[in-house]
């Protein structure tokens, strides 16, 4: 397997509905996150992400499979999630706000992983270069 770093140690944000009382905050302390109603992607292993956030294995976290389900739950049910700060001014959703997470012990990184026998074509190489440039601006 090969790993290509796309973005390293990017700041964390709390994504929540504009209707959520948290939406009025300018920032949120990292320590406060585990007190919130959280929703996460099911494909994250506990020790890889939730453990880093300080959640206990018995916390009641809503798990979803896809981005649409995640955004629907955030918009309609006052759930929140922790994500990587986007590289553009566009929000994840016009009905949500992104609140900076302060005092986090780490940022979030993104990597492209592929089998070492696979050779990316020229178009894919251009895409990877452009994506890296977006995150590094």
Q: Where does each model-flagged region fall?
A:
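Flexible hinge/capping segments at coil-to-helix
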Residues: 2-12, 16-38
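A short structural motif in glycosyltransferase catalytic domains
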Residues: 16, 64, 82-85
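Short beta-strand-to-loop elements that line the ligand-binding cleft
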Residues: 40-41, 57-69
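A bilobed periplasmic-binding-protein/Venus flytrap-type ligand-binding module shared by bacterial periplasmic
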Residues: 15-23, 109-120
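Short amphipathic alpha-helical coupling segments at ligand-binding clamshell hinges
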Residues: 26, 49, 119-133
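Short amphipathic alpha-helical signal-transduction/dimerization elements
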Residues: 34, 132-136
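Secondary-structure junction motif
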Residues: 22, 34-57, 85, 121
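Beta-alpha-beta core module
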Residues: 1-5, 9-11, 69-117
